[in-house]
Amino acid sequence: MDPSVTLWQFLLQLLREQGNGHIISWTSRDGGEFKLVDAEEVARLWGLRKNKTNMNYDKLSRALRYYYDKNIIRKVSGQKFVYKFVSYPEVAGCSTEDCPPQPEVSVTSAVAMAPATVHSGPGDNATGKPGTPKGAGMTGQGGLARSSRNEYMRSGLYSTFTIQSLQPQPPLHPRPASVLPNTTPAGVPAPPSGSRSTSPNPLEACLEAEEAGLPLQVILTPPEAPNQKSEELSLNPGFGRPQPPEVKVEGPKEELEVTEVGGFSPEAVKAEQEVSPSEGLLARLPAILTENTAQVCGLSTSTTEITQPQKGRKPRDLELPLSPSLLGGQGPERTPGSGTSSGLQAQGPALTPSLLPTHTLTPVLLTPSSLPPSIHFWSTLSPIAPRSPAKLSFQFPSSGSAQVHIPSISVDGLSTPVVLSPGPQKP
């Protein structure tokens, strides 16, 4: 017998064989009922077939319950060890030549058993249950749905849909790639970034910067075409000028544009070179470009007004800790440079990276003399500080006022404004 035979096929073959009457026998050939005369022996034979030596009737009966839902075998109520073939009512009267094809058809699935009954018998004449046509109908519908799904998967519509969903985005990248090499065949990343910043849609410019910005990093002397591009940037400072505040990333690019226009001094170019860290930060271009376009879109200043404070703003931030008089009375006039520099600083701390140390490194800005006043600052908050003899000898240089006000710029990083008073330190 085939080793892949199922349990109901195994019982059916035992019933067909003549020498197994002492273990299993028919009780009603017309109704398809049979009885397990020796249930443990039948279970042992089934265990030998499946290479399970510990098979018993309890496990066999649980296996037979699986066929209850499949409408193949049913337990006859009120009679012990008596079962009934529901889908094979005339299987007892069939001959040996007609019966073997039935189990072979149903090896794959129990539901596929029903079409085999169509050839063996017209239906259940005893009970009148049309189980065979119902099973055949279910098999036909399942096969129909399965074939339609396979046809859909093989038709190419599924794969074509997913590929076409990605189609609209790639044409955005070859378009600027074809336009940018025309203006600058082997240009620096500055002209591509300038053309992206002048585009009306900043989101599209950010997407173009991710794909088309990196492959064009070839540093060569550009031809006369970048002159026209830099002139367009000088005519449109509203969108073309977000790059100069971002000196940390856009330093090398602006240096090339400044030298092409010719309206800047070499000192300003050197100042931008000192501030810019390296060209390796070009990977952060999309996030910075989006942030600048959202914040500095309304800024309209000339190129000279933006570059000149860039030259002098860095030393002023460094000179602020070295001048004690600034802490005394020049809080609002921290940068006595030009009105444009104060206007740029008024836009917010996120405009220029040079202002970030002002807010994040507050203890560095609170060092006006050789003795660090940060220690003195925190000692005033301590209840033990007035009793310390080391702190009685030092006081803030004041211009006759009883209180020393720290400038608002230097304490923006703190949560609350702090006023230092040398009064509690006097004995």
Swiss-Prot record:
Checking Pfam families in the record gives:
Ets
- Please tell me whether the keyword DNA-binding is annotated for this protein: yes
- Cellular localisation: Nucleus
Name one cellular component (GO) term: neuronal cell body
UniProt biased composition (Polar residues): 300-310
Q: What is its main location?
A: nucleus
Q: Which UniProt keywords apply?
A: DNA-binding, Glycoprotein, Isopeptide bond, Nucleus, Phosphoprotein, Transcription, Transcription regulation, Ubl conjugation
Crosslink feature (Glycyl lysine isopeptide (Lys-Gly) (interchain with G-Cter in SUMO)) location = K229, K248, K253
Glycan-bearing residues: T380
Q: Which GO terms describe its molecular function?
A: chromatin binding; DNA-binding transcription activator activity, RNA polymerase II-specific; DNA-binding transcription factor activity; DNA-binding transcription factor activity, RNA polymerase II-specific; double-stranded DNA binding; mediator complex binding; RNA polymerase II cis-regulatory region sequence-specific DNA binding; RNA polymerase II-specific DNA-binding transcription factor binding
State how it assembles. Interacts in its sumoylated form with PIAS2/PIASX which enhances its transcriptional activator activity. Interacts with MAD2L2; the interaction is direct and promotes phosphorylation by the kinases MAPK8 and/or MAPK9. Interacts with POU1F1.
The molecule here is called ETS domain-containing protein Elk-1
Q: Which organism is it from?
A: Rattus norvegicus (Rat)
